[in-house]
């Protein structure tokens, strides 16, 4: 069994010096879309256009819990080996949002992969598929 650890502090792994040249998505900052571990970014304009479109449709901010991940960060958080987060995917907090409205806005914005959890929704543009993080999440989402 391989154990991966990282002893860097948050200030060391999240520098505020991510270039913003060409950044056109007013509701999101490059830092929140980059890897929380090393600040690596993956620039995918079509994905960001769709995310901005979903945000515009909802008309309220939403919190990105996780977006791009480097392979080490993905392993540290227990992500799937071929996770869409290795390119670009988002986990969006459900706090303050109607889950059904958020899902519908993301679906209409051309997201195709959805993971349903009790406190967040995962959205990506990989192969079309859906899953529930837990039995409790399945019950929660099927009631909405």
Label every PLM stretch briefly.
Residues 18, 30, 74, 109-111:
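Compositionally biased, low-complexity repeat tracts
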Residues 1-57, 127, 138-144:
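Extracytoplasmic cell-surface/polysaccharide-interacting catalytic and binding patches
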Residues 35-37, 62-67, 93-97:
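N-terminal start-of-chain detector that recognizes signal peptides
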Residues 22, 72, 77-81, 118:
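Solvent-exposed, flexible loop/coil residues
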Residues 48-78:
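Extended, low-complexity, intrinsically disordered C-terminal regulatory tails
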Residues 46, 59-61, 94-95, 125:
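Solvent-exposed, well-ordered amphipathic alpha-helical segments
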Residues 2-7, 81-144:
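Catalytic cores and adjacent binding grooves of peptidoglycan-active enzymes
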Residues 42-44, 69-73, 92-94, 100-103:
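A short linear-motif detector with a strong N-terminal bias
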